[in-house]
């Protein structure tokens, strides 16, 4: 008999509860620090992860819950500028599309949030390396805690 996907996911969440609880606390502290210091939340991802990054950025800027009246929080998703992405990729390759945008947009008050299901995407890893080298806070949201992006 095939197991219910909800039950499977619930088991995974329960097995990782302590790890997730601590991770959520750390991420919350980082976001609070960035917001208090007038920094930006900068999101990136590829494919479905790009969609997640764009959605999260929209939530911070626009508060998509109409009952929630608050000021917008500076946020951007690096996957939205198709003119830059296609031009840079055509001339220089896809591996540095996010790193290049971080060079132009990010500073030490900001946080770079990288979404990657595999955690092995070169453009994500290169952006994390750049952010770390410049003292920009980084958060990696991946499908594997053993991935290259998670180790950074």
Regions found by a protein language model. Give the residues of each.
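Glycine-rich, small/polar surface segments that engage phosphate groups of diverse ligands
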Residues: 33-105
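Generic N-terminal amphipathic, Lys/Arg-enriched alpha-helix
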Residues: 1-19
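A short, well-structured juxtamembrane/interface segment
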Residues: 19-37
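Short, glycine/polar-rich helix-capping loops at beta-to-alpha or helix-loop-helix junctions
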Residues: 140-152
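Short beta-strand/turn micro-motifs composed of small residues
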Residues: 79, 116, 142
């Amino acid at each position: 008999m095939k197991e219910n996907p909800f039950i499977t996911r619930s088991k995974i969440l329960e097995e990782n509860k302590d790890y997730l609880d601590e991770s959520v606390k750390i991420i919350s502290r980082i976001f609070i620090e960035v917001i208090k210091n007038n920094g930006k939340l900068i999101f990136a991802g590829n494919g479905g992860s790009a969609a997640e990054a764009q959605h999260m950025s929209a939530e911070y800027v626009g508060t998509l819950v109409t009952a929630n009246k608050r000021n917008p929080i500076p946020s951007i998703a690096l996957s939205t500028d198709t003119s830059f992405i296609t031009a840079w990729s055509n001339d220089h390759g896809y591996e540095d599309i996010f790193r290049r945008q971080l060079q132009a947009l990010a500073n030490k008050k900001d946080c770079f949030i990288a979404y990657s299901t595999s955690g092995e995407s070169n453009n994500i890893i290169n952006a994390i390396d750049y952010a770390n080298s410049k003292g920009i806070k980084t958060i990696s949201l991946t499908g594997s805690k053993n991935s290259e992006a998670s180790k950074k």
